Amino acid sequence: MIVAIKRAKRFSPNSEDKDARILNSLCDLLRQSGFDIRIVDEDDFCLQKDAEAYISMARSDKALVELDASKVPVINTVRSVFEYCQNREFQTVHLAACGFNVPEPKGKDGYWVKKAYGYSECEDDVVFAPDEEACKAAKAAMSERGVKPYVCAHVKGDLVKFYGVSDTPFFRFYYPDDDGEMKFSNNGHNGVPKHTPFDEYDFMYEANAVAKSLDLDFYGGDCIIRDDGERVYIDVNDWPSYSRCYKEAAEYMAIKVIKAVHHGNIDLLRERIENGYYEAVIFDYGGTLDSDGMHWGKRIWHAYQKNGVPVDEPLFRDAYVHAERTLAKNPIIQGNDDFTETLRKKLTIELDYIQERVEGFYPDEWLDDILDTLIEATEESTNLSNEVMRELFGDYVKKGKTILVSNFYGNVNAVLSQFGLDDSFSQVIESAVVGVRKPDPEIWRMGLRAIGVSDPSKALVIGDSYDKDIIPAHEIGCDTLWFMGEGWTPVIPDGAKANWVMTSWFDVYEP
């Protein structure tokens, strides 16, 4: 059973419904995955004997002290809430010590006087002061209420609200001053955003690093993008409402919870890999080595979103399925087609399908931009995979113990070559070549036979598809490592057939 702890109303000023919505969305997904869920109020919470994990929005000292005695996983951790998110001054000092940009104590553009410890429960807990005299008055007023004030300088630039789930691809950011959606009315002091250009990928990785330094799994915050493109972190919070992106966020949050429940002893896995325990390590390709565990349908959809393609997700999904079926039935992909050419052909089929159904839609306006986005993302993923193959599995590669097993079009070797992965595998078992497709367990047996391994228990299978990789490999007796990422459907398997679960290569690989 997983116990979900609701946030008390006093900790959800103007956000009570939104906080309830994200918790309920997450719980619904976990129920669909087969978990028993019990929801309790934080003011009534006590430890449950049969709990496998706690997912907690709690912020009260009473609930957090109780949770601190838990022997099962707690998301977010008590430490992240108690030490880092409830103490604004300590959080700022900690982030600065970790090398992240934070507001200075003094400045010439005004000040923010904030409740130093605990959470903002009303507008009087966060006050803008245009000058030092107003700052002194705001501090005095806060002190009179029995609240210790914390002061930092106002930072000019674009205000950005960001949301993430640590060590997953989920990261979103928004400009609240574009639409005026703010928790308190005093948040509009940065004015109309300029949308100053900055590196969005770098923001994603840096925000994830910020969250990890605070021990947060579910996180959000406020950041200022200065005119020079530098980012300054104003506040980082535990478990925000994810109001603009709660459906997507809930999917990744569910992945994180399932991983916590079925994580397995990851130290044992590292030890086995490093000590040469396995006679074979078998990798899936698509989704595992080239997209960080994310289903390729989702990766393409996110590229459509990033480029502003005027199509809704249901139509995109139809186009994606149509393209997959078309490529499966017709010899469109040739054996020497590399990744770029393969993807160009796939996208062309998708976009032509959309054009037939959307008036005024022209594929040529979108093809190159989508393709460039996907190539950039794939290069980033495969660069890390190359590093993992070289550093973590290097001895296995040298001894010819690494195998690729993939459902592909007959050109996987050309694709591997484009990304420098062609020397990583002694054998490649490709469905279009051998005539067997996943989830048939036989394709995994073919991989074992290819290098003369007779004992499946001495093989490790790594794949992103629970149904096509993990279950059949488990059935024949292999150890399995499930690379759990954003799936094609919101229903997430419970992971019980996986020996280990990861949401990032960094779960098993330490550079």
What positions do the PLM features span?
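N-terminal helical cap/lid subdomain that shapes the substrate entry/recognition surface
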Residues: 273-391, 414
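A short beta-strand motif that forms the metal-chelation/ATP-contact edge
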Residues: 51-55, 114, 162-164, 229-244
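Active-site nucleotide/adenylate-binding loops and adjacent lid/helix of ATP-dependent enzymes
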Residues: 4-7, 12, 70-71, 78-159, ...
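Asp-based, Mg2+/Mn2+-dependent phosphohydrolase catalytic module
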Residues: 268-278, 390, 394, 401-511
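A short glycine-rich, hydrophobically flanked beta-strand micro-motif that places a catalytic Asp/Glu
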Residues: 41-42, 151, 216-228
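C-terminal active-site "lid" helix and adjoining low-complexity regulatory extension at the edge
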Residues: 26, 212, 216, 225-275
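Conserved N-proximal alpha/beta basic substrate-recognition cap immediately N-terminal to
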Residues: 7-104, 119
